[in-house]
């Protein structure tokens, strides 16, 4: 498979993309980033009646389960990654993480919530910002 930058450059112009397609691309790039860090993705787009968790991964180095919120941007109009995660969003992520954990037999030494921001379109290569342990 070609590198991420070649793959992204070969896609159609961003102006023709739907929000869902841009979000899916951002999640794919976030998963590749997590893989490069040695993390193992357990689930993607886990849903329940209270919402959705974008990516659930295991960080073997920290013996932690990591709930990852992915924010994909094509402009800076909506602020950066840190501004995208409000206290209300953190509360929702914690609640969803608790529900996901309640349905599992496996236990981890730690639970963490990370945010990955993916900025597409400003440069030839997507910009990835990974904030660890936001909650």
Swiss-Prot record:
GO MF entries: nucleic acid binding
Pfam families from the UniProt entry: UPF0102 (PF02021)
Sequence similarity: Belongs to the UPF0102 family.
HAMAP family to which the protein is assigned, alphabetical: UPF0102
Name of the protein: UPF0102 protein Mkms_2031
Recorded superkingdom: Bacteria
